[in-house]
Amino acid sequence: MSENRTRFRLNQNRAPIYEALERFRQMRVVPFDVPGHKRGRGNPELTAFLGQQCVGVDVNSMKPLDNLCHPVSVIREAEELAADAFGAAHAFLMVGGTTSSVQSMVLTACKRGDEIILPRNVHRSVLNALVLCGAIPV
């Protein structure tokens, strides 16, 4: 890695989403929304298994925590930090697992009739994306 790439443009010691979750947790807002464990109060067994630290910050998307579909604050900042860390122009956080991430990647890069080089053992999410966009595997 070149010396140039080891210097980050942004402060990589930040954790914007975690910091926002901690600020929200300290507000002690009473949950009337999903998830049903109500930050552990509604399911003591789950809290015992995962720990209060985990369930205490497992909350639904709300304004202080930004919105993954249209990030404008802490999620956008986290994406910018990730892009900076990887030396990329952009980075996008995903919550749908590998399948939605792979499909998003293929659907972004390919359109009907495009050829895409793929190995025989691709994940089925790639095949699904090919069906959706009409690209041709070669």
Task: Label each residue range with its predicted role.
Residues 104:
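N-terminal active-site wall of soluble small-molecule enzyme domains
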Residues 133-134:
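Short, structured coil segments at secondary-structure junctions
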Residues 109-130:
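Conserved PLP-anchoring active-site segment centered on the Schiff-base-forming lysine
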Residues 84-85, 107-110:
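Glycine-rich helix-loop-beta junction characteristic of Rossmann-like nucleotide cofactor-binding loops
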Residues 98-101, 123-125:
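Short acidic loop-to-helix transition motifs that present clustered carboxylates
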Residues 1-73:
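N-terminal "arm"/small-domain region of PLP-dependent enzymes with the aminotransferase-like
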Residues 52-100:
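Conserved N-terminal alpha-helix of the aminotransferase class I/II PLP-enzyme fold
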